[in-house]
Amino acid sequence: MHHSTRKRWLASIGAVAAVATLATGGAVTAQAADAPVIKNADVAYPSFKGSDDPMKTAANNTTYNPAVSYLQETFDNDVKNLAGIDTDHDFWIDKILTRTGAQPTGKGTNDKGAYSYEGSDGNNYLFTRGRAAYMYTHTPNQLGFVGDTAYWDQTSRSGFTVTVNADGSNQTLNEDASQRKQTPSYFTSLFQTGGKSLKIKEVKYITYNNVMVANLTVESTQDRDVTLTTASPFAAEGADGATELTGRVNVKNNLTTIYPRFSANNQDGSNWIVSGGKLTSTLSLKANEPQTVKIQLGLIANELPDSTKEYEARYTGDLKDAAASYKDSVTTYNKWWVDNAPYVDTPEDNIDKTVVYRWWLSRFNMLDANMPGNTFQYPTSIEGVLGYNNQIVLTSGMFMMDTKWFRNPEYSYGTWLSAGDTAKKSKAGYYYYHDNPGDPANWNHSYTQYITRAGWDSYKVHGGPSTVAEELADQGAEDVQGLLASKSEPDNNDNQNNNDNSLIDWSWWSMTGNDADAVSFSEPGRSGQRMDRADGSANMWANANAAAQAYKAAGDTANAEKMQAIADKIQKEVTTELWDKSDNLLKHKWLNDGAFAKYKEINNYYPYSEGLMPTGNEDYNKALRLFEDSNEFPIFPFFTANQADKAALNFPGSNNFSIINAQPLLQVYSAGIRNYDAAKNGYITNEQFKKLLYWVAFAHYQGGDNNYPDQNEFWNEDNNNVGDVNGDGVINNLDKNLDAAQNGGKITYRSWIHHTQLGTTNWTMVEDVAGMVPREDNKIELNPIEIPGWNYFTVNNLRYHDQDVSIVWDKDGSHYGGPAGYSLYVGGKLAFTSDKLAHLIYDPAAGTVEVKDDSSAQVTVGAEAVKNVKAANQVTFNADQRVTDLFAKSGTNVDSASKSTTNVAKDADVTGTTYAEKDTNYPAKNAVDGKTVMESFWGTKGSENKTDTLNIKFKDGKQKIDDIRLYFYQSSSSQTISGYAEPANYKLEYQKDDGTWAPIADQVRTPNYAGANYNRIQFTPVETTTIRVTFTPQAGMAVGVKEIEAYNTGIKADGTSENQTPQVDAYVSSSTSSGAKLVGTVKDDGLPAEGDVTTTWSQVSGPEGGTAKFVDASAASTTVTFNKEGDYVLKLTASDGEKEGSKEITVHGIPSDGTVNVAPQSSASASYTNGYQPKDNAKKVIDGQVVYANTPNETWNNWGDSTGVEPWLQLKWAGKVPLKKAKVFFWTDGGGVPMVSSWKLQYADADGNWQDVKLADGQSYTVNRNEGNEVKFADAVETDKLRVVFPKGAIVGASEFEAYAIEPVSVDEVNRLVQTGSKADDLKLPSTVSAVYTDGSRRDLAVTWGKVTDAQLAADAVFDVKGTVAGALNGTVAHIAARSDTASQTVGNAQPVEQTVYQNAKSIDLPATVPVKFPNGYNDDRKVTWKDADIKAIDLTKVGDYEVAGTVDDGSSSAAAKLTVHVVADPNGSSTPEPEPEPLVGWIEGKATRTTISPDSEATWSPAEGKLNDGVVVDDTWPTTDDQNVNDKVWGSWGKAKDGMYAQYDFGQSVTIDQSRAQFWANFAETDDSKGGLEVPDAWKIQYLAEDGSWKDVEPTEDYTVVRNSPASRADTDAKGWSAVTFKPVTTKSLRLVLTPYTGSSTFGAAVAEWGVHGIDGTEPEPTPVDKTALESALDTANGLDASRYTAASWAEFQQIIDAAQAVYDDANATAEQVAEQVTKLEDGQKALVALATDVEKSTLQAAIDAAKAEAASGKYTDKSVEALNKAIEAAEGVLKVGEVGEVTQAAVQEASASLNKAVKALEEKPAAETVKKESLEASIEQAKKADKSKYTEEAWQALQSQIAAAQKVYDDKDAKQADVDAAQDALDKAFWATKVEQKPGSQQPGVTDTDKDDKDNKGDRVPPTGAAVSVVAAAAVLLTAAGVTILKRRQSGDHGSARHSA
């Protein structure tokens, strides 16, 4: 499955760890074998293949000038050179990243030659994208946008398709993939017919605001008319003849709604025409004169108004022309680079190209959907838009390290603002960073991260008012304190400080982001244990430290000191608790025993990369020694795990590497060089740093080819087949690692997520290579790491503190033509030049440069240097800047034009509607706490008020305000709090000085109607102490107010304050025979101030005689039923009293079948729910949302279920409901949660026991994918519980479980008249209400009433209480009247009542009560008795009205009760019965009403639909050569074939069938296992649907034949290519063709061209008399048996068989089969009788027992055999003892006798005593005692002493066995020979001689690296072999467990 666990999933890590432990003998040495030390310093550089000019410098003649933007200059030159006019004139960045053809294909080359790799992208992924729209998958060989279109995430539909018709037929156009070309801004390719007489050049692109455009240039070699048709599943609504199609789509997880618009233009400007939900146009082409048309699909979102502008400009505006549209889009796209991206140039173009590519990755993986709400309202960096596709906190900080260098702050600021606003509330009350709730299916935790630290760095780059720093500090402080307090979170993985210290602890490797690569978790015996972690703690320290600095910048000294104290405590505990002094290393530490974790990762060094470790400490510096050794932490591959530790454990888990590893390695390298003397000590040199830059660049290029960059999620060398590369005698991952970095390098596996970002590297080019150091003040600091051999580089187009900045290194001035040396340019002016690379701090105001290192650099300050560089907090933002809006969304006013940015409503005295004050989770104070974080809100859930109110009294008294901001909570995904939406409208008032309330006048609202999250209301200033907001909720939703803010801005509003028309939207959620669900939304602007909004549904049109019946016409969302099938136009109208808005929708109405889906009224539960889902996720199956896409958290599944019970999914109602059918929608992710194989329904009977539901005739349990699986019941099932049951052990998923109850005609209402002052409990509203059904019956259905309070009854009042009725969607109502004169109301008048019943009902039940109206005018229900004569007079066979009189039982009515019964015709009935269908005879496959196939058993390009019975059979027109395309003729299952796959015909009536045949096809003349392909199945069979709903095999009367059709044999056999079978006739409604497909070493699939079915007339002949003679004889025999000779139980069962047989004998209609069956049952029953033992048999057994006892007591036999005999004696005595008190069977006595005899025969006589020889053991003991201690290690010596003691103990044991003696001697000898091996001089590196004896490599004070080779193991092996001891080599072969699929 696809749940939140990251990257790689292991089937059984415990098993892998166990194998590792065995393989190493439990050893914990760092390295298991004597691998030669390979220094990273000796690692070579990679070799890049592909283009000699990867940066396309030859195509760019722009002269570099650091004083201006090189990208701007280049862009301007591109425009001058006509870039953008067509695809032959590209912009420079597009040229650099251009991809052509369908390359690469998995073939790479290095210096050694060619090699293969897995995971190439084939140029299949579409680069062009909009801010929210893109192609998640892309099918480039089809015209249009074909694949899975994403709007922020997958929609599971193509954008649009294009078909071509010419010469009267549809044309097949094939892509010429060699002509494929794509750049970041567009994609183009060529399509043509087979004869190339017709070709189309397609150019497609997606505009910034999500308009998907395809320009098609159509050309023909001859004059002809060509008709083009385009269709989009997004937009198919529109009248024929119109020029545009529209649609409406709720995007995934209901995050927003898009309103697609679809149109197309011809070259002459005319529009395409709508026809049948598609757009079409006919082009009259002249030979070789091309015409260009343009198709556009606008994915319009209300929150992106420019999406409408961009679409309309192309539909009818100035971009209607195809060329103009294209130029606008690609030009806009490429201008973005100028506005945002820094330019980097170095001596290595291959690195420079990765810089460009990575800027593009940051852009491609950025979501900027501006969705209002709590998910993606900010521009946000996403991890893997082609993969996980979520803002994941683990990687958000990494992405900001790059995006902070974008010139606009919105990208980095947006990411940390998003993380802050979606933070999760902890049990301790803090809000900690948590993965974005927009996509809970892909990551849903709080992982290690440094968001606050990265955010603080971004602030130091871009700056802003101090309130920006304060915002960051607040969210950072919440996060750190939340993590430190996390011990009791519902998700245990979110508990990260279980021992109350200041360190992060985890038990799950995914928290690191490295999953099974994190070797520390694989320590044997530690599975599931927690450890304090260096990585998470370092990141938390960085965040705490950043929060402290941000508070300090904001002027909040108290909080700054608080957070600094927390940071200092974390630092202290890391350096004390996690520092292992014994070997000078940081290590993780196990919580349970305080032991250091033995195994390490790069993660152990995060305290270095984050700067936590103090500098100047030689011990701390020595910890970096491991980076000197490639066997520990190689430069490449840059793994997570210390490779020596991985080797010591035999490489458990996975061993991947990724940019997520390269990033911290770069950080460790740079920190080590700068701060920890790593270069000085030789651990990490500048040369190594350079190599790492090169290898990081190399990793991006597929096959090492610089034409094809692709960052995958991870890479590995698992499938790299190598020998013993390092010469250690063992072939393992160390050899693969070494091979990967040799011969120029190679990567053999690239993972499945393409063009993702997991880690970043561009920051190192700016900060480490160029040396830019972000600061708060107005100084500029440079601190570069010198790259050996690089004599020049530049970083240009930087934006820093609101200034343009360039950095240039030109050693001798020859490369760029400027000053020689190291120069800084600010604001277009030279600031200074240093003669060398050095650590420098430039003070612009003073015009000075401070040299901070010992370089003795000589610096010259520029004469015109800019002096007014701002400090970070001096940077301002205006209203036009995007960043101002972002902060407004987060509750911070940074608009520089604002008179005051102080929110006067913060911490106000706030009161809300009284009911809500009781909800401590969401109290009113949350609305003024200064937080817009999503879970801090005041909520009205549970309120039954029409409106709810908040009063805000300012804490500082009267305030002048002109700007109020409201932030509303919005529910969306499963990780948001359900049931909340922005209000339908809200009203603002202020309190005047006299205490009265007045509406705030002249309101200008943005948006006009309430929106999720941010709403701004500007108005004429008022002075007040208190404001009030009144909210009207949307139907069925509560209102959540995250924050209310009030400002005095002095800014005049733009916009209107006039009343706006109510906003109305509506759509059809679903439409079935149980009604259509209508979802409506009505919003208003709150004007007029005293007005109320009303809503009404009405029918505009429909089929003749068709009527739409609304369950509640006044509700915005309701259900409607129809009496006739057809199209209905329905209208939702909303009025505010002045203006009216409406929305019309079209519904295809299906006549009601008399049922309604009552599942939403139930509560859902399951036997087990996936542990990664919310515990109550079963509720998703009744939420009304059918989901087929891979969204686990929006569905239910039981992945991980090990309960051992049959999985079930249950619905429970408040009372019994009459169910008639059910429908289940199954869900699969195609992996861990497979498609359901079978299921059944059960209901709870009256006793609560589960019973199988009996299905109606012809019904069966189907398992169809992507549609509902419906079953109808034989009879109504009256129950309060229904469940789906799956096979035991099944892993299953379900999206929706619908249960349909008989729909009542009406439900009785309730009337109560009570005394004023009564208590609510005195109302005693009934627990059930009576529901009336069309068949005349009534049922008492459970009702749940709304809340009634004592306050409502305290004074005279009249009100209604709604009741939810189980089984009735429209519910009921109780009319309550509280009157002070109630006691005097004794006699009233019974009110007339009515009841409707359908004609021909069997009977009618009448109401038990009637309302009686009393003199005060109010009703009360009283019991009634109806007149029998009137009831009998009702003629249910005739339509008419009938009156029934009745008497109120208690005499409270002075008049007779009156009931009018309306007998009406059944609108769904028929006056004449349907005739029986004629039998289908002959070959009837064409008469099948439906064809389906088994789940997931067809190739998408070769579906079964329309193929199997289309009459297209194999003939001589089929291919004669191998491997030709027949996909349009067959049901093909290549890649999907599996045993038991089937095709199914449904006939819609009973048919009798006696033959079937099929034509199979193989696409190779001979089966070729090496090629695979389509192949004839090994076997096939026919199954039919039996009456009991099961599938049964037919009984062949002739064997099945299998005929092979192929290019060598095209139906030219005697059988004409048919495989056939004849069988005993079966009568059924459905038939299956079941296949056993061929399997081979390659991928195969079955192909079926045609499937024939032969029917015969199955009409039953008149029955002949049945012969019952045999049954009569069998009954006589049975009745003559003596019951006393058998056990009572067996006789009772036999008697039932006799009774059943007698009943058949007495049945005149019994068939011959039934008679024969009873004869057989009587015979079998008699055989099953259990005979009782006779007295003789029991006496014989007793004698045998006595004899056996004598033998047992004789003492002649072994104890073991006597023990077995005694058990047999005991068992035999037990049998006889049973006979004393009850029945003992003959079989039991016989069995006991046999067992006893067997035990006697098995007695064994005692052998002579064993002689044990101990001489050899004695000799070994004496030898060991003389051992020389100096020849042993201390550990080996202690082991020897232990073995001596153990051997002596065995020697002294007189009862010791020979085996014990031998084992003791073996163990002692092994320990004796475990001596040390003599160390040999010389290098361990293959090919290197031992000539370098320089002391620099052998310093006496050097701490040796961990993981050094331990040669003792090898020596001991030799010695032990000499001693006759064999060492068992255990080595796991093949794949070591690295899974390539995310769980």
Swiss-Prot record:
Residues 1061-1157 form the PKD domain. It catalyses: 4-O-(beta-L-arabinofuranosyl-(1->2)-beta-L-arabinofuranosyl-(1->2)-beta-L-arabinofuranosyl)-(2S,4S)-4-hydroxyproline + H2O = 4-O-(beta-L-arabinofuranosyl)-(2S,4S)-4-hydroxyproline + beta-L-arabinofuranosyl-(1->2)-beta-L-arabinofuranose. InterPro entries: 6-hairpin_glycosidase_sf, 6hp_glycosidase-like_sf, Big_4, Galactose-bd-like_sf, GH121, Ig-like_fold, MGH1-like_GH, TAT_signal. Optimum temperature is 30 degrees Celsius. Optimum pH is 5.5-6.0. Residues 892-1049, 1142-1302 form the F5/8 type C domain. Residues 1875-1906 are annotated as: Disordered. It holds the Pfam family Big_4. GO terms for biological process: polysaccharide catabolic process. Coiled coil: none annotated. The keyword Signal applies. It comes from the Bacteria. Predicted to be exported by the Tat system. The position of the signal peptide cleavage has not been experimentally proven. The keyword tRNA processing does not apply. Residues 1678-1716, 1746-1790, 1823-1864 form the FIVAR domain. GO terms for molecular function: hydrolase activity, acting on glycosyl bonds. Residues 1-32 form the signal peptide. The chain crosses the membrane at residues 1908-1928. It is a single-pass type I membrane protein. It is found in: Membrane. Gene3D superfamilies: 1.50.10.10, AF1782-like, Galactose-binding domain-like, Immunoglobulins. Beta-L-arabinobiosidase that removes L-arabinofuranose-beta-1,2-L-arabinofuranose disaccharide from various substrates such as carrot extensin and potato lectin. Also acts on L-arabinofuranose (Ara)-beta-1,2-Ara-beta-1,2-Ara-beta-Hyp (Ara(3)-Hyp) but not on Ara-beta-1,3-Ara-beta-1,2-Ara-beta-1,2-Ara-beta--Hyp (Ara(4)-Hyp) or Ara-beta-1,2-Ara-beta-Hyp (Ara(2)-Hyp), suggesting a specificity for unmodified Ara(3)-Hyp substrate. In the presence of 1-alkanols, shows transglycosylation activity, retaining the anomeric configuration of the arabinofuranose residue. Belongs to the glycosyl hydrolase 121 family. This is Beta-L-arabinobiosidase. It comes from Bifidobacterium longum subsp. longum (strain ATCC 15707 / DSM 20219 / JCM 1217 / NCTC 11818 / E194b).
